[in-house]
């Protein structure tokens, strides 16, 4: 096989605009495939018949179509998506360069940027809020500043957040010039800011106020840094007096498979974290890694419909190994495995190749994990700031 395997990942289901998007699957990233070798593997008879047919259609459309034609890249991307659509697999997909870059940054847990959060106001303007001790704050950017342009490109209400983010982010140590409006009436200010590595924390933790010996750990995704952050959380909570733990995996759409194995291993003494079934029935097991920091503390895990992929791996491993009960709602149910090929224009191709199972060999695709204690959190409770699932977790640890 001429591809070089770079690493194995579990899918990241991104949460955008309040719904689950992306590919909650196991991923294997592979280096850029060589076009000449791919062509060499094509059936010559197929190539001689079908590829001219594609160009025949293209030529007719280009000559006779009455409307405005998209650019060639858009047409090519559409043709690729059309071909993949015939596979009837929603997780075999083509990912455009910008989205692929964002996924990789999220999985690394860091990116080159200026350290601002962004949101739109009711008029569609992009409002900035600099992070503490960030390049943007040191340069003079203030909360509420309206982003007008980046490197001379106007930022209007029609420019997508993905496009704005791509303009602001860039290589560490490179510089970017932004222009903002401030005040009423607005005055214009320009800042040239040197980008630095901005961390994307995936873990938050605290002692539960009602039960100060209960530690609460929430994990938003599985990135390169997650296992280290979990270790830090466990260590600090134990030092503060925590003797019981709540592990919150709600709305965690997944991430790196290896991070999932490492995180689960912090709570397990031994055993298997997951099994993977490949093409032809080949099975691979992933065992618990030694050195866990919380292998004997009482533990419960919070899950909901947004718990997917690597988060389901971890939740299933903790339950199947008799380590924790699951509290909340049924999980998303994604267990497919993909190869991800980096393509020549920085886009990527995701191809489903296998699926994974829990330690008791439960399949998750299409069914997910049913909680041991079902607690539904209503929108009214969420809006009122009441977390009945967390309340149930605290109660379960007290029994």
Predicted region positions:
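Generic alpha-helical segment signature
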Residues: 47-54, 223-226, 386
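Cleft-lining beta-strand/loop regions that shape enzyme active-site pockets
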Residues: 126-129, 137-143, 151-157, 161-344, ...
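Conserved P-loop NTPase
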Residues: 338-342, 349-377
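Terminal targeting/pro-maturation regions of precursor/exported proteins
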Residues: 2-91
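Conserved functional hotspot residues or short segments at active or partner-binding sites
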Residues: 86, 364, 383-384, 388-399
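Intrinsically disordered, low-complexity Ser/Thr/Pro-rich tracts
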Residues: 1-9, 21-45, 149-152, 183-185, ...
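Extended, small/polar residue-biased N-terminal targeting/export presequences
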Residues: 62-128, 175-177, 181-205
């Amino acid at each position: 096989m001429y591809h070089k395997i770079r690493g194995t990942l579990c899918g990241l289901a991104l949460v955008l605009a309040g719904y689950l998007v992306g590919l909650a699957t196991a991923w294997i990233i592979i280096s850029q495939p060589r076009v000449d070798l791919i062509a060499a593997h094509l059936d010559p008879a197929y190539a001689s018949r079908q590829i001219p047919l594609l160009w025949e259609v293209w030529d007719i459309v280009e000559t006779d179509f009455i409307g405005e034609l998209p650019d060639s890249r858009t047409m090519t991307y559409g043709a690729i998506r059309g071909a993949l659509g015939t596979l009837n697999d929603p997780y075999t997909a083509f990912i455009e360069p910008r989205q692929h870059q964002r996924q990789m940054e999220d999985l690394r847990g860091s990116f080159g940027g200026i350290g601002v959060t962004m949101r739109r106001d009711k008029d569609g303007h992009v409002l900035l809020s600099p992070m503490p001790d960030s390049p943007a704050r040191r340069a003079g950017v203030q909360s509420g500043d309206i982003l007008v342009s980046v490197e001379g490109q106007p930022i209007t209400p029609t420019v997508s957040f993905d496009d704005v983010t791509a303009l602001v982010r860039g290589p560490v140590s490179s510089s970017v010039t932004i222009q903002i409006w401030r005040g009423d009436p607005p005055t214009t200010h320009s800042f040239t800011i040197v980008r630095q590595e901005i961390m994307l924390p995936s873990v938050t933790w605290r002692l539960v106020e009602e039960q100060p010996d209960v530690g609460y750990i929430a994990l938003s995704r599985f990135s390169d840094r997650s296992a280290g952050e979990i270790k830090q959380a466990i260590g600090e909570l134990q030092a503060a007096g925590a003797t019981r733990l709540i592990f919150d995996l709600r709305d965690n759409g997944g991430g790196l498979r290896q991070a999932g194995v490492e995180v689960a291993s912090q709570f397990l003494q031994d055993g298997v974290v997951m099994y993977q079934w490949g093409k032809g029935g080949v099975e691979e097991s992933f065992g618990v890694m030694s050195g866990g920091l919380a292998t004997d503390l009482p533990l419960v895990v919070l899950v909901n419909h947004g718990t997917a992929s690597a988060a389901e791996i971890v939740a299933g491993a903790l339950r199947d190994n008799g380590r924790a009960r699951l509290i909340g709602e049924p999980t998303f149910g994604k267990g497919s495995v993909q190869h991800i090929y980096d393509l020549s224009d920085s886009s990527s191709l995701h191809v489903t190749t296998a699926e994974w199972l829990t330690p008791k060999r439960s399949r998750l695709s299409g069914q997910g994990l049913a909680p041991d204690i079902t607690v539904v959190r209503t929108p009214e409770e969420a809006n009122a700031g009441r977390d009945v699932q967390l309340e149930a977790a605290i109660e379960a640890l007290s029994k």
